Amino acid sequence: MSNTETASAFSHEIHDPSDAEWINDEAGLARVIERVLLEPAYAIDTEFLRERTYFPRLALVQIAWPTGLVLIDPIAVDLAPFRRVLESDVIAVFHAADQDLEVLEYACGTVPRRLFDTQLAAGFVGFSTPSLSTLAERIMRVKLSKGDRLTDWTQRPLTTAQKSYAASDVIYLLAMRAEIEAQLESAGRSAWVEEESELLRTRARGQSYADKAWWRLKDGRVLRGRDRIVAQELCAWRERRAQQDDKPVRFVLPDLAVLSVAQAKPTTFAELAATRGVDGRYLKSGAGNEIIQAIERAADLPAAALQLPEPEDFDKRLRPALTLVSAWVSQLARDAKIDASLLATRSDLISFLRGDADARLARGWRGTLMGDAVRQLVSGEAALAFARDGSLNLEHRSNQPLRVEVAVPTADWVLDAPDPNAA
């Protein structure tokens, strides 16, 4: 199906990706900024590289609005003035926005004041973190080219095919947003998406909290006791050094070396150099001495200084309740056509069962939808029962069904979609 044929079925015109205008000077960028500021919303995507750097290197910005389609070259022109658009009331429409937000924050010093993420929103109407191509095929009835995923977007000039591929990432977003929003409105879920979008917008990203960097340490869970505290201190040092040198953390000290050093706890430079996974590349420019100092700092830290990715003092007596509630949440997600990971993660359930004051299930749209039901299930006022079709029903102890009322999206592209929570 051509772009023109697709456009006839939707209120938003679909641009031909080959018509994208190349913007590589201040005058062109200023013109784009003034034009986008007149719109209620614009579609945006970014291309970047970070294979050999800590911070993302922005290589291309794709922007579309109903009457315009541009590719901005941030290598040739400073993107900082685009901050005016980001700080305005014009809604930025992304697909899978998280990394784009990090890139824009690094390049412009801020993120959009208002945003809509088609991937996030689609999770509320029957999809599970869908790719852009999946949504385009389901909603727009078009197949996107997979393109060359290994493209070095920093190289110039880009080919015509590369430009068209990049532009195709934004040409459908405004139309898809309109379709998804209609379903959200009909199901009464628009406010839910607004709430989640604000959480996405304000989430800490980019420069990780150094004391929590060890959460990403591969096989870090095998460590125990003092070894864990050493690993935490090493990863915190590694994160700060990576930021300072603008290098990936693996270039500063690989995970294997962190694990080995945490267990061996060398006290001299010679012992450190002989530790598995450590070689001279990682000990230059004072790094070796800094590693020894990190080990020494860890020796003086109390056990309470350890930052845990998940509460380990979770009452073991509540573990059966965790399993039970998880099963019911999965059933509710299937019934309501919501991505189960949006309803509640394992950490969300643990936080709620522990009675944490800031538990996500106790507030916002989650609390309204299922907070009371989970409380009744855990307290024993309600129970789960198997139905003949294999589904789970939540019932009062009086054997009366306890229903969670929730409207369901009705569009064909939603109803025909595969179960987002199927195994």
Regions found by a protein language model. Give the residues of each.
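N-terminal accessory regions of nucleic-acid-interacting proteins
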Residues: M1-Y42, T46
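An N-terminal structural lobe/cap that precedes and organizes the functional/catalytic core
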Residues: E47-A64
